[in-house]
């Protein structure tokens, strides 16, 4: 489910991005608003082909080689993601998968399934520097703090291009 397809972003030197709906965290600092907090009444469903076409049109218009979906959690609709990545694999683009890493950390097979995609880069967002800070920032169970780290390990183990993005709080 998406709010819009193909908006230009300045990140990574220019990216065409679709605005996703739905997340498994409720971060205090989240800018997404309705896509996260009101997913039932926000956006509409698109096929992977429609999403790819929207991203491709925006990327061509702005001269971008990178495409992504952001503003929510991109790993929740796994089959949709795989079908979208199949389309990207046969294109000139690189897909940036932005994720909080929870699903990847919980399921090593997910990372293995992503390993076949060579036009994929995964950006795992690490939220906080401790279990307590993570819980305070995301509302998630402190014990799930380890999952993004496990997800990064799973990705590295199977050779998926990836990096960590660390969000820290200076509130203490």
Which residues fall in each region the model found?
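N-terminal [4Fe-4S]-dependent radical SAM core
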Residues: 1-19, 28, 32-38
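Generic hydrophobic, aliphatic-rich segments that mediate packing or membrane embedding
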Residues: 14, 19, 23-26, 47, ...
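Pocket-edge positions in alpha/beta enzyme catalytic cores
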Residues: 15, 40-43, 140
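Short coil-to-beta-strand
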Residues: 19, 23-28, 118-124
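Short connector loops/turns at beta-strand edges and beta->alpha or beta->beta junctions
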Residues: 23-24, 35, 126-131
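"Short basic amphipathic alpha-helical interaction patches in structured regions
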Residues: 31-35, 44, 82, 138-139
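Conserved alpha-helical substructure of the radical SAM core
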Residues: 34-67
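Conserved AdoMet/S-adenosylmethionine-binding subsite of the radical SAM
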Residues: 56-66, 71-172
């Amino acid at each position: 489910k998406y709010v819009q397809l193909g908006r230009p972003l300045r990140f990574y030197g220019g990216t065409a991005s679709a605005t996703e709906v739905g997340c498994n965290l409720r971060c205090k600092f989240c800018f997404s608003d309705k896509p996260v907090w009101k997913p039932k009444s926000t956006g509409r469903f698109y096929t992977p082909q429609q999403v790819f076409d929207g991203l491709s049109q925006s990327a061509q218009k702005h001269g971008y080689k990178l495409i992504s979906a952001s503003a929510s959690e991109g790993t929740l609709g796994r089959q949709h993601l795989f079908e979208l990545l199949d389309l990207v694999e046969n294109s000139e683009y690189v897909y940036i998968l932005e994720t909080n890493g929870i699903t990847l950390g919980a399921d090593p097979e997910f990372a293995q399934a992503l390993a076949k995609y060579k036009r994929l880069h995964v950006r795992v967002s690490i939220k906080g520097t401790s279990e307590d800070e993570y819980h305070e920032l995301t509302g998630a169970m402190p014990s799930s703090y380890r999952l993004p780290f496990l997800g990064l390990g799973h990705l590295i183990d199977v050779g998926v291009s990836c990096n960590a993005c660390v969000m820290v709080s200076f509130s203490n």
